[in-house]
A protein has these predicted regions:
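Non-transmembrane functional regions of envelope-associated proteins
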Residues: 1-144, 179-218
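Substrate-access "cap/lid" subdomains that shape
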Residues: 138-174
Length: 218
């Protein structure tokens, strides 16, 4: 399975935590991230972050919502459940909802994923499937779309998905070619923040990289 160069990860890494401070961050940073990418024209941007807690400032939530609404590309937001802390993006026309749930096998290893989750009030596609739908006019047809599918992992240190540090994006340390026409996934890679799982090929794999693997399979 060959790595798709059109999938790029914006990494919430140790470098970004050191620069921006304690996690979770103000949603103003996410607003700045979306705004800074407007001119480079990615295909879509998906967050692997659950906004289930109160933001520090209501104005920051408002600015985040405005950045999503005014974005030139669709923004994919995961949802665990609708709360008073995340309802600001349920009412945003440019938001595509998704789920980021993953269930390990009994031995703790992530080998498979359900592309459509019907455990909500609505059917929610996985982040990876929603990203595919957002960027392919033909959609995705499969008899197994409601089943769990095995993940075909492709990973080694020399051929992994391109990762660009979150702080580098905020500071403009990237080229247009890094993101033009790309599908961007935003998520945690800093080991101290957790959100890591065992896979058949690694003992500790960031969940954002697993979502990228699933998108790569589709």
């Amino acid at each position: 399975n060959i790595i798709d160069n059109d999938i790029v990860i914006i990494a919430i890494d140790e470098k970004s935590i050191s620069a921006l401070g304690r996690w979770p961050w103000s949603r103003d940073y996410h607003s700045q991230l979306i705004d800074s990418l407007q001119d480079v024209q990615p295909q879509a941007l998906g967050f692997n972050l659950l906004f289930t807690e109160s933001g520090e400032y209501k104005e920051a939530d408002r600015r985040f919502k405005n950045s999503i609404e005014n974005s030139s590309f669709p923004v994919i937001m995961p949802v665990l459940q609708k709360t008073k802390y995340n309802d600001f993006y349920f009412s945003t026309h440019n938001t595509l909802l998704s789920t980021v749930d993953m269930t390990a096998d009994p031995d703790g290893v992530i080998r498979r994923v359900r592309l459509i989750d019907d455990g909500y009030e609505i059917f929610l596609p996985q982040l990876s499937l929603q990203a595919y739908w957002a960027t392919h006019d033909a959609g995705f047809q499969s008899n197994t779309i409601y089943d769990e599918v095995l993940i075909d992992y492709s990973f080694n240190k020399k051929t992994d998905f391109k990762k660009i540090s979150y702080i580098d994006v905020l500071q403009g340390n990237y080229t247009r070619e890094d993101f033009f026409g790309k599908i961007i996934l935003v998520g945690v890679t800093a080991v101290a923040l957790g959100d890591r799982f065992a896979t058949p090929i690694t003992t500790s794999h960031s969940s954002i990289s697993i979502h990228a693997q699933v998108l790569n399979n589709i």
